[in-house]
């Protein structure tokens, strides 16, 4: 699964891009001073200069964002600041002012004089900043922490995967470790404001976050960050052993004096707020909760469809797919026996799966030539923190390496591994990312987070992956087994997406959620409780995947109806990939545009 920084399954909630007021004043003073003078500069030139300046300012606002976006920022004319994680703002006034200034400037361009590609970029930027501003007074409902997707859970992974391209990266990494404590202090200030406003997390969620933190700091001398740092230093290969040893000691000391104490301080600060979170149900029970949920859906899924319409579409999809699955099983009752016993899959290694997928997808998707990938196994010390597989997005200035990590702890094999590698690799995240990077689109588009498109695409390709996998299923009913396996996954994702809306928008209690799940054979109280709690803690997360998938599916159906016999599936996929990650209204607008 792909994020703005990397395709990790452990992900933070997106927060608005924040730039200092000083930079904004400098930018807009530059505009009025004639930086974008009309003398000899076309409207396209002015817009590209503006979006380029915005990119430079925003990408340099965070060391992590800069590093994961550009391996060598100096070559792009971007000077690195002192490494820092920054702070979490407790007042969004400046952020909204910036969004308004951006909106005003974007609306000032002569739209008709822009190229189609620049019009698309402008549309996406305008919608992005308008959506961020719509958060309004509900910003305290944002939650940077979480047991699985919170920043305190993701940060160690982001730091562990911090690549060393040059010696400066090593010193920046070590400096970042010293900024965790002030960063966490800013989070605690934010959490205190949430508590005062009545928006603090429930004690159940607090316990789960504290357990995650405890797990990370429990054995500091055997932390996976120590092992990974040593491995990266060795692979960097440009430092003498004496200097490496000195860096290893320095790193170990920073872990004990900075990182571990920062987590301990965070835990102590959160514990002091225990009991102040009174709501144990969905967002709708908070003041402004429904409006905040609408913001989440728009910003995370990239869709602006009304919630009730989403609910109806999901219900129809769930009903349709249950009906299809029932028909298949009635016609092939032996499939149930095979499924309960386990599908027999031909022995094939992960690299062979990815190589085979590159060939098989060419029936339905445009070919992607001259692309390389690396398969890596998740380090033993990181197994419990990472998902079964993930794609690590390369910096935009290098385009490499394209790395897919496999976590042996998940023990994915056969059909499950094949389709997971398709989701992360071909024609999923890796394929979509490389295709878009080769378009050489405006740099700013790499920062406009469009999770709904990215995860929607990687889910949209899964039914094709199950279809390709049928060639490796050792059973006379291979095609039917592959189809019913996809339907099972789709039904589950649809079911959880519906629950997300019911819990956070319509206010379902755990008892109501349990009644719904019982209809699908899920009755174990512990399982029901875990599903309910996970959705409480990650509002909108399932919808990024499944509503994104349905949005692409419905767009394809619309194009089929519009073009009739002239519809070409591969051409449709090519156009979607060419447009790249945008909000769905923008995708729909440009689906038949010429670039």
Question: What are the language-model segments listed below?
Answer:
Residues 5-595:
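N-terminal maturation segment of proteins
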């Amino acid at each position: 699964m792909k994020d703005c920084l990397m395709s990790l399954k452990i992900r933070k909630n997106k927060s608005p891009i924040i730039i200092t007021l000083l930079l904004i004043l400098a930018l807009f003073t530059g505009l009025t001073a004639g930086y974008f003078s009309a003398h000899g500069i076309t409207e396209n030139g002015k817009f590209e200069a503006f979006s380029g300046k915005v990119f430079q300012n925003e990408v340099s606002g965070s060391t992590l964002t800069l590093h994961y976006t550009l391996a060598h920022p100096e070559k792009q004319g971007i000077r690195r600041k002192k490494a820092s994680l920054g702070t979490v703002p407790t007042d969004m006034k400046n952020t909204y002012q910036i969004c308004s200034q951006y909106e005003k400037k974007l609306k000032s361009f002569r739209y008709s004089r822009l190229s189609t590609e620049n019009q698309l970029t402008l549309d996406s930027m305008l919608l992005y900043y308008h959506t961020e501003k719509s958060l309004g007074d509900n910003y305290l409902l944002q939650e940077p922490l979480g047991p699985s997707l919170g920043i305190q859970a993701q940060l160690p992974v982001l730091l562990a995967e911090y690549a060393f391209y040059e010696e400066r990266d090593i010193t920046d990494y070590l400096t970042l470790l010293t900024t965790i404590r002030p960063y966490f202090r800013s989070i605690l200030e934010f959490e205190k404001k949430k508590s005062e406003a009545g928006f603090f997390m429930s004690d159940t969620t607090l316990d789960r976050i504290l357990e995650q933190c405890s797990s990370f700091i429990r054995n500091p001398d055997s932390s996976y960050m120590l092992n990974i740092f040593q491995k990266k230093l060795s692979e960097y290969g440009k430092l003498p052993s004496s200097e490496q040893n000195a860096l290893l000691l320095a790193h170990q000391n920073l872990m004990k004096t900075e990182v571990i104490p920062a987590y301990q301080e965070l835990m102590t600060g959160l514990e002091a707020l225990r009991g102040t979170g009174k709501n144990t149900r969905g967002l709708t029970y908070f003041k402004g909760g429904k409006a905040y949920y609408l913001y989440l859906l728009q910003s995370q899924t990239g869709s602006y469809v009304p919630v009730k319409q989403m609910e109806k579409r999901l219900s129809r999809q769930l009903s349709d797919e249950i009906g299809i699955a029932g028909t298949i099983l009635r016609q092939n009752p032996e499939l149930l026996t095979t499924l309960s016993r386990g599908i027999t899959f031909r022995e094939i290694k992960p690299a062979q799966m990815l190589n085979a997928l590159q060939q098989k997808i060419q029936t339905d998707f445009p070919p992607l030539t001259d692309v390389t990938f690396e398969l890596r196994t998740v380090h033993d010390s990181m197994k419990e923190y990472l998902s079964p597989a993930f794609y690590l997005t390369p910096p935009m200035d290098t385009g490499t390496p394209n790395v897919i990590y496999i976590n042996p702890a998940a023990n994915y094999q056969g059909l499950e591994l094949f389709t997971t590698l398709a989701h992360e690799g071909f024609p999923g995240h890796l394929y979509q990312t490389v295709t878009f990077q080769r378009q050489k689109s405006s740099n700013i588009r790499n920062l406009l987070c469009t999770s709904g498109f990215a995860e929607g695409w990687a889910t949209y390709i899964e039914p094709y992956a199950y279809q390709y996998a049928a060639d490796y299923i050792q059973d006379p009913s291979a095609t039917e087994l592959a189809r019913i396996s996809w339907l099972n996954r789709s039904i589950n994702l649809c079911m959880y997406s519906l629950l997300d809306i019911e819990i956070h928008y319509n206010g379902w209690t755990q008892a109501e959620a349990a009644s719904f799940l019982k209809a699908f054979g899920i009755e174990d109280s512990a399982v029901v409780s875990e599903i309910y709690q996970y959705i409480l803690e990650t509002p909108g997360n399932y919808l990024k995947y499944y509503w994104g998938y349905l949005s692409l599916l419905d767009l394809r159906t619309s194009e089929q109806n519009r073009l009739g016999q002239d519809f070409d599936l591969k051409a449709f996929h090519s156009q979607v990939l060419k447009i790249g990650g945008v909000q769905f209204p923008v995708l729909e607008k440009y689906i038949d545009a010429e670039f």
